[in-house]
């Protein structure tokens, strides 16, 4: 099951869990009423009159909640009417469809309370047979009222009601609607066989899992029998999917290290070398002689390291593999005692008396010489020029001189040793083999050589034990400390560390991976914008420094006129200082007024000034703080309301009268008396 499907399944189960109480609160079922027989022999109505010419009978059924005393009112559980079913007396047949259906169906959509009230009325109609309840002139024949309890079930409850005029036989029951179960038809269960569950519904509404499934909602498959619980899993029944590092039909076989040539494993990614092999990947042959038999002509092979060996030759042979014979006579080709002589490319047999031929195989004897031994019979051939011996059993040879060796055919398998036993032979088997010809292999695992619950594997060179966790050695006899990191549980290049206990481990994930085994990749977070932040901070600092420089320059410029003004004031004479009128005593109202200078008798240098225009540039050294020379053009500034003001000159009799305004203005006026006599100077300061 994929992660996406698991997530969808969990959401579906959550939704089911939320909706389940609501489903249990509602219910659905059917109250069934089967009319069987109605008898009205006299054709009488409830009012005592009779039907003419006969009653045309139909029924009205009203089902409602339990009432100890039945009262008229709504049929709370349902109602139904029948068409005309017969005349005075009749039997009602079962009918499953169409008009006149029997049993009558009264469905309900609530939890069945277990009690009810039922009113069955028989009516006579003179009108329509199919919808008689709407016809005018209907008359009541009889009615019966049943009050009681009724459990949900498929068994019909049969009853019969009689009165003085009529008799009604009927039966009834309550059954649940499709997919509803339980004592009150309130348990909803819909069988399904899909991704969200595989089950059928029991009579009580409980789930019954289909074969191959289990779990609360039958959504968990039952894996193949024997599938290893930890090493395998399944997404459908009878399946066994191996987890990483395991293989086999039941996921009980570990996968050795990639590249392991001649080795096995007891845990995934291990490479335990077979006997005779070494190296990291068990690819170095430590027993080359056994595996390849490089030495020829019966020579002895000795191992001398990985892929190394030495051949010890038998007499008469030489070469790296003893493949070269030293003498052509080494095979004793001459028979009947003939001697062999080596020649350049061949050999020559020197036959003893009585024999001839290339290998001294022919005899010059005849039967008269009794050449046959051990009871052999002589038979002449070629008109007496030669003979042939017919040997008795167990003897052979041209003269029956050799005892039959029944072991020459090498009948013993698997290295068994053949032994002659008179007319028969026996095989002496090597350990681990048995049988007449040593053809049966005795399992080396029968002796249970593996200790501590190790698994024995019977191989050609002997048993090999697969040890359980915590043990090692050829026979699993050595107890070792378990290393939880030995199986390589961490993925994506993570570093494994052994935890507090031997069976625990911790994976140190590389950047970009998370999870207990570092198996989940994550999106790399964007790097912090150090360049943008540094640039922004630098710009702010530069702007602050620039503002500070501008403010400092402005302060220096503003301080310079004040210093010059104070210096000019300090350079004035005491007389000039005494004739300096403070600026606070003059008010400029920007109105043209007359300025009168009264000099007494001597008026040569003084006069009356009318509409005197004040030039603010006359005394630039006395500008107020914040004023700039040349900033303001020559403008007319007039005095306001007339307030007498006297200015003293060098001549006591000379007075300057001015009209001043008491109102404040943006500018202050200063009147200076020049050091020259009989001369009045007015200076203004902005």
Swiss-Prot record:
GO terms for cellular component: plasma membrane. It is a single-pass type I membrane protein. One of its GO terms (biological process) is pericardium morphogenesis. Pfam families: DSL, EGF, hEGF, JAG1-like_EGF2, MNNL. It is found in: Cell membrane. Residues 219-252, 253-283, 285-323, 325-361, 364-401, 403-439, 441-477, 481-519 form the EGF-like domain. Gene3D superfamilies: 2.10.25.140, 2.60.40.3510, Laminin. One of its GO terms (molecular function) is Notch binding. Disruption phenotype: Conditional knockdowns in retinal progenitors have thinner retinas with occasional regions abnormally organized into rosette-like structures in the outer nuclear layer and an optic nerve with a reduced diameter. Residues 174-218 form the DSL domain. The record marks 111, 217 as: Interaction with Notch1. Keywords: Angiogenesis, Cell membrane, Developmental protein, Differentiation, Disulfide bond, EGF-like domain, Glycoprotein, Membrane, Neurogenesis, Notch signaling pathway, Repeat, Sensory transduction, Signal, Transmembrane, Transmembrane helix, Vision. SMART domains: DSL, EGF, EGF_CA. Residues 1-26 form the signal peptide. Glycans are attached at residues 79, 109, 162, 297, 394. Interacts with NOTCH4. Interacts (via N-terminal DSL and MNNL domains) with NOTCH1 (via EGF-like domains). This is Delta-like protein 4. It comes from Mus musculus (Mouse).
